[in-house]
Amino acid sequence: MKLSKLNIKKINFNDIDINYSSQDILMKLGELYQFESGIYGYGNIWTKLERNIEKIIIEELDKADCIQVEFPKLQPRSIWDKSNRWNQYTEENDIMFHIKNNFGEYGLAPTAEECATIFGANRLLSYKQLPTTYYQIGEKFRKEIRARGYLFRPRTFVMMDAYSFDKDEENMHKTFNKMHNVYMNIFKRIGINIVPVISDGGTMGGRVSEEFQAITKLGEDIILYDKNTNIGINKEVLSFKDKETFINKLNGISLNKMEEVNSVELGNNFELGTKYSDLMEMYYQDENGNNKPFYMGCYGIGLGRIIATIIENNVLIKDEKIKGFVIPYNVAPYKVHIVYSEQNKDNAIELYERLLENNIQCIIDDRDNLILGNKINDVALLGTPKLIVLGNKYDNINYEIEDLKTGEKDIVKKENIINYFR
């Protein structure tokens, strides 16, 4: 990508929102645009980062034999009435955007249990087809009364939501545990240290829900965290009468070894049991030809929150001043940022074209109106993890590659540059 094509704006770092500096930088660059509170448009950097995260999510879900589908975002009231959730979501909790016209009443999907149940029951007619898990990645809508933190709590957002179908409770537990492992693999590949947080859902008999939290000072949630096991517990556990017994079952951890930390929820898994299958009268046939309800689970990952967490947890500070942010290499939209002095313009273009020919995504700062020093100062604005400077000391033999996160530098011969980035 030629930087001149991004048309980024000039930034005044004295005017940065220090609480959400990375997202505010993208706002001021024009790479994130707020149409209204909680409603955003996304530029090149955010969109490419989202696609890279999507790719990892899809790969891990597909490896686990999950099936990608797509449900409608505009959903008729009739299916929500079947689950008794229309009034809950439009009046009691007032979460769902909804409309009424000549065709009927509709809601903009905040979630998709109803669609998934109907879709699954229409296809999964026999116990022989179970277990099956469907997933989709797309936009969701929620009437957040207090939209805040840019993409930490917006009104429209992209998420992955999955829905599993099993024949009995035992197999539902197996799927739940399998999805736990899938999630841990996803977050590991993305580059986020995720904390599985046990949430008992009000009963002490077994794990029926689980959150995947990232520790960050910007998080609204407060969890109890054990560093040695990397396990978290919701503070609601403290209200349980036999809380010590419950906690001690979790790898022997103890309350007095846990600390309170701020965190943000990036994903969650729930065992739904037969709730939706029973309410909506959706069944499969068992070995004896009898109709039986599906045991279901639902699983969600918020892509916008993941991106917000990544860039806010990787702010680049030099000389006690915010300079930008650095995106982890695995998911970075552009792996390397090339800047050059005028005398090395041809060499820089040659490097840029070589990298692109080998499918290595990179940025070249081709803005001829800026001197080299100003170009270097702008490198961290777009989150690129690696920097190559072709300045006056460049010898046309070796490239000096700087890791913007650590400051470490590698010297790589020209002929080895492609292998370095692979």
Where are each of the predicted segments found?
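TRNA-recognition modules of translation machinery and tRNA-sensing kinases, especially anticodon-binding
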Residues: 1-363, 367, 392-422
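A short alpha->beta transition loop at the rim of the catalytic pocket in nucleotide-sugar-dependent
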Residues: 383
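Short beta-alpha junctions and helix-cap segments that line functional grooves
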Residues: 374-376
